[in-house]
């Protein structure tokens, strides 16, 4: 997939694998990987860190004027290290924590990334910040428990029919 950026937009962040030597070009191993990889294009607020040679991106898109990205990235790094301590290793080539700054919160795990939503005060009040971090940590842990160790119904998907998962309570409960 090649992305052509409008001149005012400077960044593309996605869990997809970049194609070496080809700017703004990404590849997916299969259709499931493609549709499981959110893409943020624009001028987001980003911070990065590396653990075990693996790039981690902490990104906020939207009204980021009140977001403390340095604080968030430092705490996300602690979450990654804690999860690594529990699970033994990091099972992905790189990871993207993509957060849309909106009015409500929530999130969804992806194989090599997280797409979440949070309010603009997420890093300004203790309660909002703990809510943001706990959702992010929960969805990040799904990288092991749900994306790699999963009920058979969770992949590969049947895109022609609804997919019902009778054991999702186990995956969510263990997380």
Question: Each predicted region: which residue ranges?
Answer:
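Juxtacatalytic substrate-recognition/specificity segment
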Residues: 45-167
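Terminal peptide-recognition signature
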Residues: 1, 138, 175
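An active-site-proximal "capping" alpha-helix that borders the catalytic cofactor pocket
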Residues: 83, 170-175
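Generic structural "secondary-structure junction" signal
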Residues: 18, 159-161, 172
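Intrinsically disordered, low-complexity linkers and stems that provide flexible hinges
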Residues: 1-52, 57
């Amino acid at each position: 997939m090649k992305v052509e950026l409008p001149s005012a937009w400077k960044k593309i962040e996605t869990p997809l694998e970049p194609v070496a030597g080809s700017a703004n070009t990404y590849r997916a191993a299969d259709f499931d990987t493609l549709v499981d990889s959110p893409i943020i294009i624009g001028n987001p607020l980003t911070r990065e860190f590396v653990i075990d040679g693996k790039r981690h991106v902490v990104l906020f898109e939207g009204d980021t004027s009140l977001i403390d990205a340095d604080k968030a990235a430092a705490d996300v790094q602690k979450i990654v290290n804690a999860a690594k301590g529990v699970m033994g290793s990091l099972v992905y080539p790189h990871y993207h924590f993509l957060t849309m700054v909106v009015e409500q919160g929530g999130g969804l795990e992806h194989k090599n990334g997280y797409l979440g939503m949070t309010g603009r005060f997420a890093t300004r009040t203790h309660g909002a910040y703990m809510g943001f971090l706990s959702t992010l940590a929960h969805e990040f842990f799904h990288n092991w428990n749900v994306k790699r160790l999963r009920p058979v119904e969770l992949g590969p998907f049947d895109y022609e029919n609804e997919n019902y998962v009778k054991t999702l309570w186990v995956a969510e409960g263990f997380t």
